[in-house]
Amino acid sequence: MKDVYGRELEDLRITLTHACNFTCFFCHMEGENDGDSLLSADQISLVAQIGMEFGIRTVKLTGGEPTLRRDLPEIISKLKEVGIKEVSMTTNGYLLKELAGKLKDAGLDRVNISLHSIDPVIFKEVTGVNVLSKVVEGIEEAKKVGLRPLKLNYVVTRKNAKGIFEFINFASSSNIDEIHLIELHPVGLGKEAFYTHVDMSDIEGRLNEDCTLVEIRNKHKRPRYKCGNLVVEVVKPYANPIFCSGCNRIRLTVDGKLKTCLYRDDKIIDISDIIKSSYSTEEKEELLREAYRLAILIREPNFRFRYETSKTG
Protein backbone atom coordinates (compact mmCIF):
# COMPACT_ATOMS: atom_id res chain seq x y z
CA MET A 1 0.00 0.00 0.00
CA LYS A 2 1.42 3.38 -1.04
CA ASP A 3 1.11 6.70 0.75
CA VAL A 4 -0.10 9.80 -1.06
CA TYR A 5 3.48 10.48 -2.21
CA GLY A 6 3.71 7.11 -3.92
CA ARG A 7 6.03 5.54 -1.35
CA GLU A 8 5.69 1.86 -0.50
CA LEU A 9 5.84 0.70 3.12
CA GLU A 10 8.39 -2.12 3.43
CA ASP A 11 10.44 -1.79 6.61
CA LEU A 12 9.33 -1.74 10.26
CA ARG A 13 11.83 -0.27 12.73
CA ILE A 14 11.15 -1.43 16.27
CA THR A 15 12.58 0.39 19.28
CA LEU A 16 12.83 -2.38 21.87
CA THR A 17 14.10 -0.30 24.79
CA HIS A 18 15.49 3.10 25.69
CA ALA A 19 18.01 1.53 28.05
CA CYS A 20 21.65 1.51 26.96
CA ASN A 21 24.99 0.55 28.48
CA PHE A 22 26.76 3.30 26.49
CA THR A 23 26.36 7.07 26.77
CA CYS A 24 27.16 8.30 23.26
CA PHE A 25 27.01 12.09 23.30
CA PHE A 26 25.00 12.33 20.06
CA CYS A 27 22.53 9.50 20.76
CA HIS A 28 19.00 9.96 19.42
CA MET A 29 17.54 9.05 22.81
CA GLU A 30 14.11 8.54 21.30
CA GLY A 31 12.64 8.51 24.80
CA GLU A 32 13.81 8.54 28.39
CA ASN A 33 12.78 5.68 30.66
CA ASP A 34 11.05 2.46 29.72
CA GLY A 35 8.98 2.27 32.87
CA ASP A 36 6.23 -0.32 32.42
CA SER A 37 5.77 0.51 28.76
CA LEU A 38 7.82 -2.27 27.12
CA LEU A 39 5.93 -4.34 24.59
CA SER A 40 6.03 -8.12 24.87
CA ALA A 41 7.30 -10.46 22.18
CA ASP A 42 3.71 -11.43 21.31
CA GLN A 43 2.59 -7.80 21.05
CA ILE A 44 5.54 -6.91 18.83
CA SER A 45 5.03 -9.87 16.52
CA LEU A 46 1.31 -9.08 16.16
CA VAL A 47 2.08 -5.54 15.01
CA ALA A 48 4.61 -6.91 12.51
CA GLN A 49 2.21 -9.59 11.30
CA ILE A 50 -0.51 -7.08 10.46
CA GLY A 51 2.10 -4.78 8.95
CA MET A 52 2.89 -7.49 6.42
CA GLU A 53 -0.58 -7.01 4.96
CA PHE A 54 0.46 -3.44 4.11
CA GLY A 55 3.85 -4.28 2.63
CA ILE A 56 6.16 -4.82 5.60
CA ARG A 57 8.81 -7.41 4.72
CA THR A 58 11.80 -6.50 6.88
CA VAL A 59 12.25 -5.56 10.53
CA LYS A 60 15.13 -3.66 12.11
CA LEU A 61 15.47 -3.95 15.90
CA THR A 62 16.90 -0.85 17.56
CA GLY A 63 17.10 0.91 20.89
CA GLY A 64 18.58 2.10 23.15
CA GLU A 65 20.52 -1.11 23.10
CA PRO A 66 18.32 -4.04 22.00
CA THR A 67 20.62 -6.73 23.44
CA LEU A 68 19.61 -5.55 26.93
CA ARG A 69 16.19 -7.15 26.37
CA ARG A 70 16.35 -10.58 27.99
CA ASP A 71 13.56 -11.80 25.73
CA LEU A 72 15.40 -10.74 22.56
CA PRO A 73 15.75 -14.30 21.19
CA GLU A 74 12.01 -14.83 21.70
CA ILE A 75 11.19 -11.56 19.93
CA ILE A 76 13.34 -12.54 16.96
CA SER A 77 11.93 -16.06 16.69
CA LYS A 78 8.32 -14.81 16.83
CA LEU A 79 9.01 -12.26 14.10
CA LYS A 80 10.36 -15.01 11.89
CA GLU A 81 7.41 -17.27 12.76
CA VAL A 82 4.88 -14.73 11.46
CA GLY A 83 6.77 -14.53 8.16
CA ILE A 84 9.09 -11.52 8.34
CA LYS A 85 11.59 -12.05 5.52
CA GLU A 86 14.58 -10.41 7.22
CA VAL A 87 15.18 -9.51 10.85
CA SER A 88 18.23 -7.34 11.47
CA MET A 89 19.49 -5.40 14.47
CA THR A 90 21.51 -2.30 15.25
CA THR A 91 23.68 -2.81 18.33
CA ASN A 92 26.72 -1.36 20.04
CA GLY A 93 28.20 -4.85 20.01
CA TYR A 94 29.10 -5.00 23.69
CA LEU A 95 27.11 -8.17 24.40
CA LEU A 96 27.51 -9.83 21.01
CA LYS A 97 30.31 -12.16 22.05
CA GLU A 98 27.90 -13.85 24.46
CA LEU A 99 24.69 -13.49 22.44
CA ALA A 100 25.53 -13.73 18.73
CA GLY A 101 25.09 -17.50 18.51
CA LYS A 102 21.77 -17.49 20.39
CA LEU A 103 20.42 -14.66 18.27
CA LYS A 104 21.48 -16.36 15.06
CA ASP A 105 19.78 -19.57 16.18
CA ALA A 106 16.62 -17.57 16.97
CA GLY A 107 16.52 -16.31 13.38
CA LEU A 108 18.49 -13.05 13.35
CA ASP A 109 19.79 -12.53 9.83
CA ARG A 110 22.35 -9.75 10.18
CA VAL A 111 23.61 -6.90 12.35
CA ASN A 112 24.72 -3.31 12.07
CA ILE A 113 27.31 -2.67 14.77
CA SER A 114 27.88 0.92 15.85
CA LEU A 115 31.62 1.52 16.06
CA HIS A 116 32.57 5.18 15.96
CA SER A 117 36.33 4.86 16.38
CA ILE A 118 39.06 2.23 16.58
CA ASP A 119 41.17 4.56 18.73
CA PRO A 120 40.51 3.59 22.39
CA VAL A 121 40.77 7.20 23.59
CA ILE A 122 38.34 8.58 21.02
CA PHE A 123 36.06 5.56 21.43
CA LYS A 124 35.72 6.38 25.13
CA GLU A 125 35.18 10.08 24.40
CA VAL A 126 32.34 9.22 22.04
CA THR A 127 30.68 6.37 23.95
CA GLY A 128 31.53 7.15 27.56
CA VAL A 129 32.86 3.63 28.18
CA ASN A 130 36.26 1.98 27.82
CA VAL A 131 35.21 -1.28 26.15
CA LEU A 132 36.55 -1.11 22.59
CA SER A 133 38.24 -4.51 22.83
CA LYS A 134 34.99 -6.17 23.92
CA VAL A 135 33.12 -4.64 20.99
CA VAL A 136 35.79 -5.94 18.60
CA GLU A 137 35.36 -9.41 20.16
CA GLY A 138 31.63 -9.10 19.50
CA ILE A 139 32.32 -8.25 15.87
CA GLU A 140 34.49 -11.35 15.53
CA GLU A 141 31.77 -13.53 17.07
CA ALA A 142 29.14 -12.10 14.72
CA LYS A 143 31.34 -13.05 11.77
CA LYS A 144 31.95 -16.49 13.24
CA VAL A 145 28.25 -17.38 13.56
CA GLY A 146 27.35 -15.98 10.13
CA LEU A 147 25.46 -12.75 10.82
CA ARG A 148 26.03 -11.50 7.29
CA PRO A 149 26.26 -9.10 5.62
CA LEU A 150 28.04 -7.55 8.59
CA LYS A 151 27.87 -3.76 8.60
CA LEU A 152 29.53 -1.15 10.81
CA ASN A 153 27.93 2.23 11.50
CA TYR A 154 30.24 5.22 11.99
CA VAL A 155 28.58 8.50 12.94
CA VAL A 156 30.90 11.24 11.72
CA THR A 157 31.65 14.06 14.18
CA ARG A 158 34.53 16.43 14.80
CA LYS A 159 35.81 13.99 17.40
CA ASN A 160 36.35 11.09 14.99
CA ALA A 161 36.43 12.57 11.48
CA LYS A 162 40.21 12.37 11.19
CA GLY A 163 40.11 8.62 11.81
CA ILE A 164 37.70 7.71 9.01
CA PHE A 165 40.21 6.29 6.57
CA GLU A 166 42.05 4.40 9.30
CA PHE A 167 38.65 2.95 10.17
CA ILE A 168 38.07 2.00 6.53
CA ASN A 169 41.41 0.16 6.48
CA PHE A 170 40.50 -1.64 9.71
CA ALA A 171 37.13 -2.74 8.34
CA SER A 172 38.65 -3.90 5.05
CA SER A 173 41.34 -5.97 6.77
CA SER A 174 38.78 -7.39 9.23
CA ASN A 175 36.56 -8.92 6.52
CA ILE A 176 33.68 -6.55 7.19
CA ASP A 177 31.14 -6.45 4.37
CA GLU A 178 30.08 -2.83 4.54
CA ILE A 179 30.40 0.36 6.55
CA HIS A 180 28.03 3.31 6.74
CA LEU A 181 29.51 6.76 7.23
CA ILE A 182 26.56 8.57 8.79
CA GLU A 183 26.11 12.31 8.92
CA LEU A 184 25.25 13.55 12.39
CA HIS A 185 21.68 14.80 12.40
CA PRO A 186 19.90 16.87 15.05
CA VAL A 187 17.42 14.41 16.53
CA GLY A 188 17.07 14.02 20.31
CA LEU A 189 20.44 14.69 21.95
CA GLY A 190 21.84 15.08 18.46
CA LYS A 191 20.36 18.60 18.57
CA GLU A 192 22.66 19.50 21.46
CA ALA A 193 25.65 17.82 19.81
CA PHE A 194 25.11 19.34 16.37
CA TYR A 195 27.99 21.75 16.96
CA THR A 196 30.22 18.74 16.23
CA HIS A 197 28.62 18.28 12.81
CA VAL A 198 31.04 17.64 9.94
CA ASP A 199 30.34 18.51 6.31
CA MET A 200 30.58 15.23 4.41
CA SER A 201 31.69 16.84 1.13
CA ASP A 202 35.42 16.58 1.84
CA ILE A 203 35.02 12.95 2.89
CA GLU A 204 33.16 12.13 -0.31
CA GLY A 205 35.88 13.89 -2.28
CA ARG A 206 38.53 11.69 -0.70
CA LEU A 207 36.44 8.58 -1.35
CA ASN A 208 36.14 9.57 -5.00
CA GLU A 209 39.94 9.76 -5.16
CA ASP A 210 40.87 6.65 -3.18
CA CYS A 211 37.97 4.31 -3.92
CA THR A 212 35.61 3.46 -6.78
CA LEU A 213 32.05 4.77 -6.94
CA VAL A 214 30.04 1.68 -7.83
CA GLU A 215 26.46 2.89 -7.58
CA ILE A 216 24.01 5.44 -6.26
CA ARG A 217 21.36 3.58 -4.30
CA ASN A 218 18.07 3.92 -6.08
CA LYS A 219 15.73 4.73 -3.19
CA HIS A 220 17.77 7.10 -1.06
CA LYS A 221 20.39 8.19 -3.62
CA ARG A 222 23.20 7.18 -1.27
CA PRO A 223 26.61 6.89 -2.93
CA ARG A 224 28.29 3.50 -2.48
CA TYR A 225 32.02 3.07 -2.97
CA LYS A 226 34.22 0.00 -3.27
CA CYS A 227 37.42 0.31 -1.23
CA GLY A 228 39.18 -2.97 -1.88
CA ASN A 229 36.70 -5.66 -0.85
CA LEU A 230 34.81 -3.25 1.41
CA VAL A 231 31.65 -1.34 0.49
CA VAL A 232 31.45 2.18 1.95
CA GLU A 233 28.08 3.91 1.91
CA VAL A 234 27.63 7.59 2.73
CA VAL A 235 24.41 8.31 4.63
CA LYS A 236 23.16 11.90 4.68
CA PRO A 237 19.51 11.79 5.78
CA TYR A 238 19.04 15.20 7.37
CA ALA A 239 17.43 18.01 5.35
CA ASN A 240 17.58 15.66 2.39
CA PRO A 241 14.40 15.54 0.27
CA ILE A 242 15.87 12.78 -1.89
CA PHE A 243 16.33 10.60 1.19
CA CYS A 244 12.78 11.32 2.32
CA SER A 245 11.29 10.71 -1.11
CA GLY A 246 12.52 7.11 -0.99
CA CYS A 247 11.65 6.40 2.64
CA ASN A 248 9.94 3.03 3.05
CA ARG A 249 10.01 2.87 6.85
CA ILE A 250 7.68 3.19 9.77
CA ARG A 251 8.73 2.97 13.41
CA LEU A 252 7.13 1.15 16.34
CA THR A 253 8.14 3.00 19.49
CA VAL A 254 8.98 1.37 22.78
CA ASP A 255 5.60 2.36 24.26
CA GLY A 256 3.45 1.20 21.36
CA LYS A 257 3.10 4.04 18.87
CA LEU A 258 3.43 3.96 15.10
CA LYS A 259 5.75 6.83 14.22
CA THR A 260 5.52 7.67 10.54
CA CYS A 261 8.69 9.80 10.45
CA LEU A 262 11.80 9.80 12.63
CA TYR A 263 12.01 13.60 12.45
CA ARG A 264 8.41 14.36 13.33
CA ASP A 265 6.36 14.11 16.49
CA ASP A 266 3.04 15.12 14.93
CA LYS A 267 2.38 12.13 12.69
CA ILE A 268 1.98 9.38 15.29
CA ILE A 269 -0.69 6.73 15.81
CA ASP A 270 -0.98 5.37 19.36
CA ILE A 271 -1.76 1.64 19.21
CA SER A 272 -0.76 0.80 22.78
CA ASP A 273 -4.36 0.57 23.99
CA ILE A 274 -5.12 -1.89 21.19
CA ILE A 275 -2.25 -4.31 21.67
CA LYS A 276 -2.38 -4.19 25.48
CA SER A 277 -6.16 -4.57 25.66
CA SER A 278 -8.23 -7.62 26.54
CA TYR A 279 -9.82 -7.63 23.09
CA SER A 280 -9.85 -10.87 21.16
CA THR A 281 -7.03 -11.49 18.69
CA GLU A 282 -9.44 -10.91 15.81
CA GLU A 283 -10.56 -7.56 17.25
CA LYS A 284 -6.97 -6.46 17.78
CA GLU A 285 -6.05 -7.43 14.23
CA GLU A 286 -8.88 -5.38 12.72
CA LEU A 287 -8.08 -2.34 14.86
CA LEU A 288 -4.41 -2.61 13.89
CA ARG A 289 -5.39 -2.70 10.22
CA GLU A 290 -7.29 0.56 10.72
CA ALA A 291 -4.24 2.04 12.49
CA TYR A 292 -1.92 1.08 9.62
CA ARG A 293 -4.33 2.55 7.06
CA LEU A 294 -4.41 5.82 8.98
CA ALA A 295 -0.62 5.85 9.44
CA ILE A 296 -0.09 5.43 5.70
CA LEU A 297 -2.70 8.08 4.95
CA ILE A 298 -0.99 10.75 7.11
CA ARG A 299 2.56 9.73 6.23
CA GLU A 300 4.52 12.45 4.46
CA PRO A 301 8.18 13.41 3.86
CA ASN A 302 9.63 15.79 6.42
CA PHE A 303 11.93 17.34 3.81
CA ARG A 304 10.50 18.09 0.39
CA PHE A 305 11.61 19.78 -2.80
CA ARG A 306 10.41 23.34 -3.23
CA TYR A 307 9.32 24.43 -6.65
CA GLU A 308 9.12 28.12 -7.44
CA THR A 309 6.73 29.45 -10.06
CA SER A 310 6.50 32.93 -11.46
CA LYS A 311 3.67 34.72 -13.12
CA THR A 312 4.22 36.91 -16.15
CA GLY A 313 2.00 39.37 -17.96
Curated annotation (Swiss-Prot):
Enzymatic class: lyase
GO biological process: Mo-molybdopterin cofactor biosynthetic process
Database matches in InterPro entries: Aldolase_TIM, Elp3/MiaA/NifB-like_rSAM, MoaA_arc, MoaA_twitch, MoCo_biosynth_MoaA/MoaC, rSAM
Cofactor: binding comment: Binds 2 [4Fe-4S] clusters. Binds 1 [4Fe-4S] cluster coordinated with 3 cysteines and an exchangeable S-adenosyl-L-methionine and 1 [4Fe-4S] cluster coordinated with 3 cysteines and the GTP-derived substrate.
NCBIfam families listed in its UniProt record: moaA_archaeal (TIGR02668), PRK00164.2-1 (NF001199)
Role, per record: Catalyzes the cyclization of GTP to (8S)-3',8-cyclo-7,8-dihydroguanosine 5'-triphosphate.
The protein's name: Probable GTP 3',8-cyclase
Taxon lineage: Archaea, Thermoproteota, Thermoprotei, Sulfolobales, Sulfolobaceae
